[in-house]
């Protein structure tokens, strides 16, 4: 459809505007920002940002009731919804591959410490900033809410139980390097998984999933990057919103306290 083509153009324009690729092309960051804005203006700009776009995969009722050809507010382009087992993205294969061992998963994708440390505190400051109030003795407390939304860490509660991943854990296969399917980093993947799926071979429960090709949040971030390069953080060209406005809206949606 037209909106998908416009979204792909936005992706390509941002890459083409980069100094790495811009030689021999007339595309610049202003053009890339305009291409992204064309997509976003169709949903009302920043006001059209989905309130649940940061955890679309957890909107289980919405996914289960999704009609053929329909898309949730966050999703610009998606594949077919199914609960079949023939695709890694579908049925309960993602959950079987990535749940911790005590939840009958294979623990394959393990987020890194670098990724965990990239999440700021709930005030928006990096954990290395003295203003962040980061507590090294309680490293997961008062963090960006998206950390708990996307990553299972030591002490996380998931599917009604506490997950223990620390190296001293005994009698628990979720601990660091305990068995071949245990985490190698101290973390397990949570993003994209449905908590109501059950890979237990004695009580398997598959749920509907659908692959996502383009989310509106991606286009918002495309705009923010290009607009910042073209007009600065609070410039907006001919549009009603700036890079600052977009990033603030995304952080507000996540529950990060406004610090500026």
Identify the role of each PLM range.
Residues 1-95, 101-113, 117-260:
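Acidic/polar-rich alpha-helix caps and helix-coil junctions
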